[in-house]
Amino acid sequence: MMRVFFICAMLCGILMGCSQSVSKDSLLEDYDYFFSQLEQIHPDPYSAFGGEENFKKEVRQLRNELAGTDSLTLDEMQSKVTKLLSALHDGHTYMGYDNSPKKVEDRWIPLKFKVIPDGIIVNGFSPELKFLKGAMLCEVEGESLESVLDRLDKIVISENRYGLMGKACTSIGNTNVLRQLFPSFDKERVSMKFRMVNGRDTLVRLPFHPNGPFWKSIVWSSADERFPKNNFEYRFVDDDKQTMVMCINSIASADVPDIEEYGIKTDVIVADVFAKMLREMKVSNSSRLIIDLRGNGGGWTMIMYAALYELYGKRFMETDLGMHFSTKISEAWLKKNNTTLELLSQSRGKSLKLGDFMEEPSVISSFDWFMCADKSILEEQHGEPIYTPKEIFVVTDVQTFSAAFHTAYMLWKMGAKVVGVPSGQAPNTFMEITPFKLPNTGLECSASNSLQSCFHKDHPMAKTLTPDIQLSYDDYRKTDFSNDAELIFLIQF
């Protein structure tokens, strides 16, 4: 099936020297290179713009606009390109941002936000704003949140409404973003209306603070120490050993060849850790497994096949997952996978050329598709599951993305219940990053190389995988808006 690279490792651009000192001509050369690569790599860069002609027209118009500026900076170019790319609603395609220090002029309101099924709530605050804990955001500068989100959708990249709300959480309190949302905004405070825990609306005028030591004073909603927090850490959370919780905050393990090259240090082998956990559950005849995928930005989908095989045995390999995946062949994709057209054609048993699409199977029928460092663990099962608990829950939030979304989706197709907040990843979307570097700035960028379809295009979940169980605002309130509200809810479920 698909190979989804660890997205967090790719999101940070690496610049040689000072990006802001690059000449306008050099930046425009990078602009041209970016869009030439996008057209070669991306499976469909045109449809969102109304066709190839309109796409090229918009790219040309933006280039002319950038060329007409007196002094063009990389930040300005990236911001404009991101606005244009927002039409794709593709979280794997981006012109990356550089790794220079945060600008002093960046200022933020002293609040942090979180997405719940009903909207956006406050889950971090400076001490004097404690009264806003758990308050629901309703308006910004006199405009409804829905209206503000519609504006934000035109300047950031997101795949569905929940992903857009996730972007709002990290950007809506920033002065530079507010100026883009409200062109005439030039104030020392921003007005926001909140619905308080008691149901009353409160208008608050919030000041801005620059990057610096102030942010150490932010108070966050609490986490519950009963639950594991490290990657692939697991533990029973009840005295009777009936409920096991595993935390997976990155789909990355030692199963990935040369994992250290991605800046990741781990000795976890998925087949090994899942086998140990399931055997512990089997000894105690445990009835419930909770897999926590919140905050998981992705990684390598194929390392999780071993976990599903250990949970479900040969039934996993006989199940049509309904995930249709089509990959476009490009020079950059071949380079990423360290192969050639000749070798690829041989492995596929047919002649392939650049621009062709390869269809991947929706049934994982062979261990050949597994990325597993120790398949002997799986072979010893002889098709039988190690242990299948009566109830399996997988917990998601807006940050459950890419390979983490795939994991949640596959578990759901196998019968697990999805719990929490919908993923910001659309089921029907573009997928997989193919990285490339801009020649002058050295900036790391990416274009999707595949089309993914989990549902018919008119299916109500084509853009948003709706969880089977979603908490109400009152459910969150009952946990004092704990960061682990979904897990607390489940162990009481």
Positions of predicted regions on the chain:
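Bacterial Sec-dependent N-terminal signal peptides
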Residues: M1-S21, F34
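Flexible, low-complexity junctional segments that flank or bridge functional domains
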Residues: Q20-I290, G295-F325, I329-E342, E391-F393, ...
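Short N-terminal or domain-adjacent regulatory/targeting segments
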Residues: I172, V363-Q381
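Active-site neighborhood of thiol-dependent amide/isopeptide-bond enzymes
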Residues: R294-N296, T388-F405, P427
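Low-complexity, serine/threonine/proline-enriched polar segments
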Residues: M323-M371
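Extended, charge-rich low-complexity interaction segments
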Residues: G349-I364, S448-Q470
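Short, conserved helix/loop micro-motifs enriched in His/Cys and acidic residues
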Residues: M371, E380-V395
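C-terminal soluble interaction/assembly domains
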Residues: S402, H406-A408, W412-M414, V418-I433, ...
